[in-house]
From Swiss-Prot:
Lineage per the UniProt record: Eukaryota, Fungi, Dikarya, Ascomycota, Taphrinomycotina
One GO term of the biological process aspect: macroautophagy
Name of the gene: trs23
InterPro entries cross-referenced by the UniProt entry: Longin-like_dom_sf (IPR011012), TRAPPC (IPR007233)
Descriptive protein name: Transport protein particle subunit trs23
Protein role: TRAPP plays a key role in the late stages of endoplasmic reticulum to Golgi traffic.
Keywords: Cytoplasm, Endoplasmic reticulum, ER-Golgi transport, Golgi apparatus, Nucleus, Transport
Assembly notes: Part of the multisubunit TRAPP (transport protein particle) complex composed of bet3, bet5, trs20, trs23, trs31, trs33, trs65, trs85, trs120 and trs130.
Length: 132
């Protein structure tokens, strides 16, 4: 895994975490632009799909990495950047959504749609990443 970003239903970046060290790490501003771009392209892809009820882009394959997208029923997008050989990204995205539900949404001090600043979420995310 390279990075995880969470985009709220309005298209704003509310969480970003890189895993390991990467010489091509993005700046915070670049992550904001990336989140807005992903949100827009995802929305357009649902409209231009020839099949009604399309859920939009779920996987984008690039030359050196893959971008996996999980859109929740509430419109949140969990975006995971992985190596090409990663096979269980969908399960990982489900787990990240589960951690988000357990440690962010159940936090009485968290305001929906706002940037995620939750220590328990960070700790559980790190624990999961370290174990995989």
């Amino acid at each position: 895994m390279h990075a995880l970003i969470i985009i709220n239903r309005a298209g704003s970046l509310i969480f970003q975490r890189e895993f390991g060290s990467s010489p091509t790490a993005l700046t915070p501003n670049e992550y904001l632009v990336l989140a807005g771009t992903i949100h827009g392209v995802h929305a357009i892809s649902t409209q231009i799909s020839p099949l009604p009820g399309s859920s939009g882009i779920q996987l984008l394959e690039a030359g050196t990495f893959n971008m996996h997208i999980l859109q929740t029923h509430t419109g949140m997008k969990f975006v995971l950047f992985t190596e090409k050989k990663t096979t269980n990204a969908r399960l990982q995205l489900q787990k990240f959504y589960e951690l988000y539900s357990d440690y962010v949404l159940k936090n009485p001090f968290y305001t929906l749609e706002m940037p995620i600043k939750c220590q328990l979420f960070d700790e559980q995310l790190k624990r999961y990443i370290d174990s995989h």
